Amino acid sequence: GLLKAVDRAFELGAETMQLFCSSPQGWAFKAMSQTEMSEFRKKATSFDIGPIFLHGIYLVNLGTSNQANLRKGIESLGHYMRAASNMGASGVIFHAGSHNNTSYEVVFRQTVNALKEVLADAPKDVWLIIENGAGMRNQIGSTFRELGGLVKATGDSRLKICLDTQHCFAAGYNIAHEETIAEVMTEFDQEIGLENLVAVHANDSKQPLACRVDRHENLGEGYIGLDGFLTIMKHPAFQTIPFLLEVPGFKGGGPDN
């Protein structure tokens, strides 16, 4: 439950957290009671945990050619945006999806329209946050140029970006070395704007640079390495950005000490 998630974050010594508020593998969504959401906010505040982020379900795909599933994805993001507002969360992080060999111009326009629709119906106090992709085939938003295009075309200051370090590395952006991270983050700023970076998924990579596969590893046990994460954390772009772990865990049960 939600309250147990806060307890778990506190036990780990976390200062920020990310959670689902429904099964990430299904469309079903049950709205939480006002009492439950109020208790969540109070407990998170008492433990001084924040900012808090929700992660959208994995079925959301704004690039799909299946219009019924596109509609379900838009509705799911709407549910999560309202829940985030009621829970005191900063926003909803989600994967934009992929397309099936469709013209990117068509997919781009569909994705922008979907983003605009979600934001038009959403509370004004929460962000809709696109997570960068790992560069897998036909994935939307694996390059800074694509992400920047979506942000600019949507034209809403509530649309933000979460940078997943493993996805970034897998897509060919070398953030693990001082000689290259400056160039990478300069490109991010030029294409997207550093003001639109609001969260980092801090994950090491099971596969090497530009592998174009989504494979997370514990920090220091992958190709980015501990020195790589020290490089990332020292860079000015990340000084005030919350870091969220999505790693297997040393015991295989998710983030741990």
Model-found features: residue ranges?
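Active-site beta-loop-alpha junctions enriched in small/polar residues
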Residues: 1, 22-24, 56-59, 97-99, ...
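N-terminal pre-domain/capping segments
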Residues: 1-56, 60-82
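Conserved, mostly hydrophobic/aromatic
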Residues: 9, 55, 73, 84, ...
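Short, well-ordered coil/turn segments that N-cap beta-strands
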Residues: 13-15, 46-52, 86-90, 123-127, ...
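Residue-level preference for long, well-ordered alpha-helices that form the structural scaffold
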Residues: 29, 33-36, 66-69, 73, ...
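Alpha-helix-loop-beta-strand connector modules within alpha/beta enzyme cores
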Residues: 34-54, 111-125, 148-155, 223-235
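Active-site acidic/histidine proton-transfer and metal-coordination neighborhood
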Residues: 62-160
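Histidine-acidic metal/acid-base catalytic patches
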Residues: 144, 148-257
